[in-house]
Structure formats: C-alpha cells, structure tokens
Amino acid sequence: MSSMTTTDNKAFLNELARLVGSSHLLTDPAKTARYRKGFRSGQGDALAVVFPGSLLELWRVLKACVTADKIILMQAANTGLTEGSTPNGNDYDRDVVIISTLRLDKLHVLGKGEQVLAYPGTTLYSLEKALKPLGREPHSVIGSSCIGASVIGGICNNSGGSLVQRGPAYTEMSLFARINEDGKLTLVNHLGIDLGETPEQILSKLDDDRIKDDDVRHDGRHAHDYDYVHRVRDIEADTPARYNADPDRLFESSGCAGKLAVFAVRLDTFEAEKNQQVFYIGTNQPEVLTEIRRHILANFENLPVAGEYMHRDIYDIAEKYGKDTFLMIDKLGTDKMPFFFNLKGRTDAMLEKVKFFRPHFTDRAMQKFGHLFPSHLPPRMKNWRDKYEHHLLLKMAGDGVGEAKSWLVDYFKQAEGDFFVCTPEEGSKAFLHRFAAAGAAIRYQAVHSDEVEDILALDIALRRNDTEWYEHLPPEIDSQLVHKLYYGHFMCYVFHQDYIVKKGVDVHALKEQMLELLQQRGAQYPAEHNVGHLYKAPETLQKFYRENDPTNSMNPGIGKTSKRKNWQEVE
C-alpha cells in the first residue's frame, strides 16, 4: 500500500469515526473477523466495519464511501448461506467497507397492522413479536427468524419460506440509495409515503417516527408476491413456482442482493391462521406424495399452510445432530435463539485464535450437550420413521382441516402408506424437527470434519409439472458421497439437498456434475438462498445487477460477476 493510500485511508477512517463515533467503527482484523466471515463459508478482507445508528448516519456513511471510492458491502444479520453477505477473497480493485445495519432495528406498524415499515436492521423475530398481539404474521415464521435474520435481507435476496400461500419475500415499495452512472449517490423514495423532498428531510422523518396516517398512500403497488397462490396451483406449468432469479420477481430492492443500499421496505402482513392441524404422512413410494401434492394444489378449496418433506435419512441425522437446537427452541422458545447464535459466532471467532482448541469446538461441545438428554421425538413419529422412507408434514387451517382429513382417509384406503392426525404437541415437534434438519447436516460435517471432505448444500426448484421429484444419482456420483439428505417445501417443489462428501473427493468438480444433472431435469438453482458467491448469476439477473449498480461499487462479484469498477473484466 502506497503512503498516499495510507494517508487517504487514515483521513477516510477519521471521517467515519466522526460520523458514527469511534466506538461504532472497527478496523482491527481480529475484531472485524466475524463480519468478514460467512455463516457457512466465505470470507475476505475489509478496511473497516461501520455501525451507523440512524438512517441519516447511514446516508452520510454511504456518501463518505462513495466520495472515497470504496466498495460498499451492506450487511445485516450475516446469516446468508451462499457467501453473499461478506467479502469474497482479497482480489478487489478497491478497499471494502462493511456497513453493518444491526443498530437500525426500528419497526413502524402502519394502520392496524395490515402493513409494516421495516428498517435495515429489523429482524424477522422482532417483526413476528410486534405483530402477534395484532393477530397477524410476517411473510416468514419459524426458520430464518430463529437465527436473527433481517427482514430487508430477505427482500434483497427474495428469500423463500415454508408457508405455501405467501411465496417468496417481495415488495414494490422501498426506500433505497443508488450510485448512478456518474458515480453520484441518489436517494429514491418509492415507499408510497410522503416524507419530504431532500434526503435529510426524508430520513429524519423516519428516524424520528413522524409518519402520520395521511402520509401513507395506497396506489396499487404490491407489498407481497400477490399472485403466488395462483402460480403454485398451476401444476401443469413447465417452470418452477419460485426461484431466486425469476425475472418477474426482480424489482428495485427486491432481489437486489446488496446492489442498492436499502433504508426501508413496506410490506404486507398476514392474518394469523387459526385452528391449525398437522397431518403426519408416511409412504415408501415417492409417487404417493406426488399424487397428494397434485391433488391438493389442483382440487382443494383451501391451500395448506405448509407442506414439508423429510426423507428418512435426514430424519435420522436431524434426530442426532439437531437435537440441541430442537431442545433449545422447545424449552427456551424462539426468542432466545438469536442470542445463542450470536454467542456461538463470537465464541467461534475467539477460539479460532487459540491453537489449543480444535476447529468446530462449539459444535462438538453442543453435540455432547445434546446427548445428555433423553429422546425428544414423539413415539408415533418414531414409529412412522421405522415404517416409511418418505415423510410429509401437512399443516392445514380452518375449513382445510376437515377437507384434508376426509380426503386422506379415502386416499389411503388404496394408496401405499398411512397418516396420523397430530396432537398439538406432536404437530409442533414435527415441524421443529424439520427446522432442526436445516442445521443438522452442517453440524454433522463439523463434528466429523476429520472423516468427511465437506458438505455440498444445494437448494433447487423443480418444474411444477415434474412427477419425478425424487433424485436418483448415477453410481459414479453416488460413490463419492457418505450421505444424501433430502428435505424441503414440498408443495412449492423447493428442495434442500445436502450431500456429505467422502474424504479426498474434489467437491468443486462434484458440484459441477450435480448442477449439470439439475440442468438436464429443468430445475432452477438456487431456489431461495440466492446466488451469493457460490453460483453464477444468469444473464437476466446480471442485467438487473448492472441496472441497479452501474459503477459496480456495491457488493461486486456477486453471482460470479466482475469485482472491478464499472464492470471491467479481468484481462
């Protein structure tokens, strides 16, 4: 680094400290490590991590970064699974500044709770908690909310979710900053709320909670994926119901993946479903679940609340390696989970510096902790696990409960398999077990890191008319794997496929073989975790990124695109 650059950076960092206070600026690599390292994988260098305390401070920090020609990486909870929330390596052509929005966690309820205004650090959990007394729910419930994921992070990555009727996270109403073609920072207010003219007026009004009912307009723009229920019912369509790069779901902040700095989003909320009932379905024939899905989506008057699939293998892995997660949520509640994940992240970062500790110490310790407790799953679930390879957790509500029960009784008079009507405790534990599955494969890999090469995690969206949903791998690929773990959102045909790879296997080459097979099946990937730095963005998505960020100063390199200024390619 030249002396001029060092001097310039010193002045720049002094300016950031002046804007937010020195206690809200980190430059020591040891202290910035947990913000530079991804939730599952991925890391890189950063000049600084800065924590603005108001939207106006965020605007001023952005302006300082643009003036100093720095790369800007917006980060909220850093719970992304595909490395899109952190720097990627050290081959950028400019310094990287991470702007953490964790302090900007306000939430504004509009009207009687039919809509909300979420800020950059608002978490799904805090939104869920605020809406509960109003009898309403956000787009996403148990899942991302338990690990402190942010609302805006979900919008920016059009995240999915387990709720069949709500589709991917989406809005057409947001407030965002964009760096234009001339390298100038501009603030765009498309919230449909009168907040003033200048950035200072607009942001101060939000910071001070000075929004009146008269300021809010209802002009026909959508604050959720309004036609998803029609798409998911179209079982003859030759395309997936939802996936990250769907061109029809890319709109300004929605799907921007950090190419815009999003200050606020306006979102619809949903009436909480009452009188819910879980049906636990088991079969040894995949085509039975195919028939159930197609019949329900095409013929039921009432769509399911959720329909979650688990294969017996992930059932077993989750029972053993997701036990501590299950017990913590079951005994302590979801509100404690963000704290524990945060604590684990801090502990891991600290222990990495101590040579005495083996890698994944906290995972190994929590695994041993889980063994101290007796079996946690209900007897009827265990019985179904022994009988059946394929499991479907079908949750219905209201009139849908009777509709599903009468049809399932008739259907299983001739179909292979069976179902039982869960008690409230069984239903809760069944879905909690399914949630624990999402982290169980990672835990398995961490505990057995000496014996396995890595985990290859894919999330895929199948065509809605596909009847061959259950994967059969060729022997040359199957022989490279220790475990194949299949689970997902069955009604939406979105599957999480985690492969535990044998020691010594080239994981990158294996992944390319896997993706080739998925392309042959007409699947889209990723389905809901977004491209991050692990997947190549398709051309339509790259075009969207270029339109949002013409100078390539915001989260460059995402989707395996250029990291260089003005989208220059490496020669």
Swiss-Prot record:
Please state the span of the N-terminal signal peptide per the UniProt entry: none
- Cell location: Cell inner membrane
Checking Pfam families in the record gives: FAD_binding_4, Lact-deh-memb
Protein role: Catalyzes the oxidation of D-lactate to pyruvate. Electrons derived from D-lactate oxidation are transferred to the ubiquinone/cytochrome electron transfer chain, where they may be used to provide energy for the active transport of a variety of amino acids and sugars across the membrane.
Region of interest called Disordered, as start-end residue ranges on this chain = 546-571
Name any cofactors this protein relies on.
Answer: FAD
The domain comment in this protein's record states: Contains 3 domains: the flavin adenine dinucleotide (FAD)-binding domain, the cap domain and the membrane-binding domain.
Identify the PROSITE patterns for this entry.
FAD_PCMH
Q: Which top-level enzyme class is recorded in the Swiss-Prot or TrEMBL entry?
A: oxidoreductase
Q: Which residues form the FAD-binding PCMH-type domain?
A: 42-213
Q: What Gene3D superfamilies does the database record attribute to this sequence? A: 3.30.465.10, D-lactate dehydrogenase, cap domain, subdomain 1 (3.30.70.610), D-lactate dehydrogenase, cap domain, subdomain 2 (3.30.1370.20), Uridine Diphospho-n-acetylenolpyruvylglucosamine Reductase, domain 2 (3.30.43.10)
What modulates its activity?
Inhibited by 2-hydroxy-3-butynoic acid, but not by p-chloromercuribenzoate, n-ethylmaleimide, or 5,5'-dithiobis(2-nitrobenzoic acid).
Under Enzyme Commission nomenclature, its number is 1.1.5.12
Q: Which family, according to UniProt?
A: Belongs to the quinone-dependent D-lactate dehydrogenase family.
Q: Which reaction does it catalyse?
A: (R)-lactate + a quinone = a quinol + pyruvate
Instruction: Cite the GO molecular-function annotations of the record.
Output: D-lactate dehydrogenase (cytochrome) activity; D-lactate dehydrogenase (quinone) activity; electron transfer activity; FAD binding; flavin adenine dinucleotide binding; oxidoreductase activity, acting on the CH-OH group of donors, quinone or similar compound as acceptor; quinone binding
What are the alphabetically sorted keywords of the record? Cell inner membrane, Cell membrane, FAD, Flavoprotein, Membrane, Oxidoreductase, Quinone
A single GO BP: aerobic respiration
Q: What is this protein called?
A: Quinone-dependent D-lactate dehydrogenase
> At which positions is FAD bound?
A76, A77, N78, T79, G80, G84, S85, G143, S150, G160, V262
Q: Gene name? A: dld
Q: What is its main location?
A: membrane
| Entry GO terms, CC | cytoplasmic side of plasma membrane; extrinsic component of cytoplasmic side of plasma membrane; plasma membrane
Q: Specify the protein's topology with respect to the membrane.
A: Peripheral membrane protein
